[in-house]
UniProtKB/Swiss-Prot annotation:
Regulation: Ethanol and carbon monoxide-bound heme increase channel activation. Heme inhibits channel activation.
Gene3D superfamilies (alphabetical): 1.10.287.70, NAD(P)-binding Rossmann-like Domain (3.40.50.720)
Gene of this entry: KCNMA1
Location of region: Segment S9: 780-800
Protein name from the UniProt record: Calcium-activated potassium channel subunit alpha-1
Ranges of compositional bias, category Low complexity: 41-61, 1129-1154
Record note on modification: Phosphorylated. Phosphorylation by kinases such as PKA and/or PKG. In smooth muscles, phosphorylation affects its activity. Palmitoylation by ZDHHC22 and ZDHHC23 within the intracellular linker between the S0 and S1 transmembrane domains regulates localization to the plasma membrane. Depalmitoylated by LYPLA1 and LYPLAL1, leading to retard exit from the trans-Golgi network.
Organism: Oryctolagus cuniculus
Amino acid sequence: MANGGGGGGGSSGGGGGGGGGGSGLRMSSNIHASHLSLDASSSSSSSSSSSSSSSSSSSSSVHEPKMDALIIPVTMEVPCDSRGQRMWWAFLASSMVTFFGGLFIILLWRTLKYLWTVCCHCGGKAKEAQKINNGSSQADGTLKPVDEKEEAVAAEVGWMTSVKDWAGVMISAQTLTGRVLVVLVFALSIGALVIYFIDSSNPIESCQNFYKDFTLQIDMAFNVFFLLYFGLRFIAANDKLWFWLEVNSVVDFFTVPPVFVSVYLNRSWLGLRFLRALRLIQFSEILQFLNILKTSNSIKLVNLLSIFISTWLTAAGFIHLVENSGDPWENFQNNQALTYWECVYLLMVTMSTVGYGDVYAKTTLGRLFMVFFILGGLAMFASYVPEIIELIGNRKKYGGSYSAVSGRKHIVVCGHITLESVSNFLKDFLHKDRDDVNVEIVFLHNISPNLELEALFKRHFTQVEFYQGSVLNPHDLARVKIESADACLILANKYCADPDAEDASNIMRVISIKNYHPKIRIITQMLQYHNKAHLLNIPSWNWKEGDDAICLAELKLGFIAQSCLAQGLSTMLANLFSMRSFIKIEEDTWQKYYLEGVSNEMYTEYLSSAFVGLSFPTVCELCFVKLKLLMIAIEYKSANRESRILINPGNHLKIQEGTLGFFIASDAKEVKRAFFYCKACHDDITDPKRIKKCGCKRLEDEQPSTLSPKKKQRNGGMRNSPNSSPKLMRHDPLLIPGNDQIDNMDSNVKKYDSTGMFHWCAPKEIEKVILTRSEAAMTVLSGHVVVCIFGDVSSALIGLRNLVMPLRASNFHYHELKHIVFVGSIEYLKREWETLHNFPKVSILPGTPLSRADLRAVNINLCDMCVILSANQNNIDDTSLQDKECILASLNIKSMQFDDSIGVLQANSQGFTPPGMDRSSPDNSPVHGMLRQPSITTGVNIPIITELVNDTNVQFLDQDDDDDPDTELYLTQPFACGTAFAVSVLDSLMSATYFNDNILTLIRTLVTGGATPELEALIAEENALRGGYSTPQTLANRDRCRVAQLALLDGPFADLGDGGCYGDLFCKALKTYNMLCFGIYRLRDAHLSTPSQCTKRYVITNPPYEFELVPTDLIFCLMQFDHNAGQSRASLSHSSHSSQSSSKKSSSVHSIPSTANRQNRPKSRESRDKQKYVQEERL
């Protein structure tokens, strides 16, 4: 068998030298017999292809040449010469000579250049001096030869620079050519690496014919390209030395020259071609050039993977080389046959420190390399692999892009995304009472959701999707398809410690979204009223196109202010704008009637053409009696097509075609009756459920109509100026103005602000409104509003202007304004005073709401309402303690005791009575805000409204209730009674505004007292109200509706109070006085047969027609402005229109005989009261 191999070797060597070759090969066959079978097939093919002797010599025996070739070590096939000499050193030497030769030349050039610079340093200085000395003769042309020489040098430098710049452009990724070249080089490097993987199955060194080996030809073409690219890089390099030592350069040194050597020697050496794997490190750069990688996480992930894999493959290539070759000092005798992929496996188990032992290094070089590699490899494995797994695990969970569903709209919700905010939003947005919610909700937040929030998303997976990202990043906005979204809703953190910072964050979100897509509709929550002005600075912000800012401070304090005028109104309004399911209770308890009202919400619908030409009260009565709907407002188009929302406008206004009505109903389907109603078809129908689309309506629908389904839902194109009133004079016979000059006095006196919407006075210094405790006690305040405020110099501002403005609305006469007394820290109130100094009848008592002496000084037992606010709530981390100050103050007031005799004495003394006010008994007024008990001897009976941050803290306000701590806020007794208010109830306004943008306008009209966009722009400029002269235009703005409470105990409706029907009261009040009733404020225990001492009341919203009334009920109503209330209060009609805020003191004729005896008392006191209050208004 050995002799046959020798013959083959001789044949390959050529001619008669075959025998010698065979004998030489037989010696090595005795040593490596165990490895010979691996190369049998390859040696035979190589032998036959390279033979140049006679055919008989090459084909004498087929079996023996194979066996003779198998004697050669696995590192080489049949040698390409007669001696079987290895040539690996030639390949390695080519790389070493190239590297060190080039390095030597670079260093030599630098040395010579340095020496030249040092030697010529003095000569250079002499030339510079010569230039300076000859500077004056330059104009005469004496330096022309020098100039020509300098130009030649400059041209040479310019040519070299141009070549260098051209080479830099060619390899730069800034240009298209450069990017193509860079990507091509990387792709060819990977191709060369693949060729290495293919060749690794062959012996380390083998004979190859360049003209017949296809892979060698491809590899040669690749390396020629690498050589050209290397030249470009060398030319473009600024520092040639550092370029020579770069990793990519070293890769080229050890891979390119050996290919040329292999062509020359007609043999191949696998060698260091594995270094091409180091090119994988640039993989992330290539993907960035192609704009495939854009996020930091993806770039980091690809970087880690490329470094890890390139290091792994390169190290495996080195082990493969040394293990298959053996140690040179051992004459390559200790080699072992390992495939490249076995080496890859070996390196992985080595890095992971597992080390199974099935594959291991035998050579000294291999083991020495493993010793050093295991140190770095272990560190890399331990750090890179966990990070890679973490990036892969987190990357795809909430990444990706939103895929829009055809025929289905989607909205984007961002901002403060937490379990509480999202659950409240989804509960209201996806409520079953909403008609056909075919909207998908896409949440975008930069923090991944926790487990609870994730579970919430999964429960609503059919309509909710979450994506991790930021609205400040245009890439993330593109992912959620913001350009095709129906709207973008931004939630605010109501409990943040710095409200201004939170508002600034949301304003930046608005700017980012509008910058990306100016036409997107945005609804955002704002915490502070003064920050709304910054939204006006955004060019693409347009409230006419549906953009809205829901200011929580403005609405929260507006709700509370309305409760000062009609206690319980805050609860009723909050329930109307929230979606609540109907909860049926069979037992005859107060909860039964309360929950029946809670199920009512606010809806809009276009009115049927059957109502065209009818007056508003007529349509309102018809809707209530026949359709079982309560209409409280309409959208009115004036002659110039300007749209306004009018609340209970009165009988002078006629319904137009296409009028939008605002209804209170239990669901959206009921409101459709107002659109489907037809007098011809439905006039005799008694069951409102049978009022459906009739044949007449179908004929109308076939004709062109201006009412689109989208308008019915959102009415986006008919945005009106919020709170603006029609500039029309009332023509109701009961409301004919007598002599306006009596009430408005001299038109040259500024009594109202420039818009005519609020009472105004000249700015006052805070020192002039501060009362000491003794001054407050001597003043004997009565029928006023006490505002207990907790705050200090470092507290965030609440924005008390939003509380005062509704109480100073111009649709009150001056004598009807309630005096406001602030009790709190003077340091805090000084910070708020700049926004309050233009309002009349405001006083400050420095102190603390927890001091009973301060509370007694302001006669808290005689106040119409006590408001408890805190500016320190968000500075406490423990949510259960956030409301501690308000709760303590409330409990403190409720535990106070008062002497009735002192109260009666004070009420009849020369105490506080603003000019023109009647001191009549409040208990017999037909219209008043809160039916005061004959006397208050305990603090429990004092009307209080407490602001809470944490809903669960409501359980601490009433010690005698049985509310469960887990009960929702709207189901608790304090909220139902109107004695507690939490800002969380305003969350529902986000979804309500989205579905109907007129809803926010309506609620702001109701609670702010008449704030308009013009007024907001003015406040944004000056941060204060500007006084204006009384003109017919501004005075016409006073003619608007307001909320009041109607007492049934006595007065024109006393006959209905005892067992009458609510529907009869509704119709009588509407027909007789244009008063629109919409709810009842009833004693909690009124349903009990036995009399109770409990004075707590609860709210009943929109009771049915047949609902039975009791004498102690107070009726919520929308009252017209009474022009004559400022002149005369001697008629019944005027008393029915007097304000509930002034009814406790004046503005009505009462039925008790003692009234006449008291009529002269205000006149006798007027001069004394003016000294303290009227004079303040004129300062």
